[in-house]
Amino acid sequence: MTSPKKTTTLKILGFLILSLSTIAASHHIPTSDIALGKKIYHERCEVCHGNLGDGKTFAANVLFPPPKNFTSKSIKTELSLKKMVRSVTKGRPNTAMMPWETVLSKQEILSVVNYIQQKFMSSQK
């Protein structure tokens, strides 16, 4: 027979394991979200930020400041998820980055930001 103390400990341990697995799962980006982000990026962002995410486009020659280079070495420390979502949602003052909050849903904005981070920023050294 199991003691009440051991039973309580096992229940708490089980709860913690379930909680941690739920937290870990919430940080996983479903494939469909990445696919949606890719679609949005190529339709709406690529013209300024480029196919490679480096901002080397015709737009870079005519916009000041030039579009953000998502492949630069300093970009990971410069751009957090929160800052990127805010920039896409509200736009960036004194730049050509327009607000997308009336065009894209919150889920679409998060999908495109996740795509940018995964595609262009995750391989930074």
Language model features: what each stretch is:
Residues T22-I40:
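Electrostatic cytochrome c docking/interface patches
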Residues L63-Q118:
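Extracytoplasmic electron-transfer domains, predominantly the class I c-type cytochrome c fold
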Residues K11-S21:
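Bacterial N-terminal signal peptides
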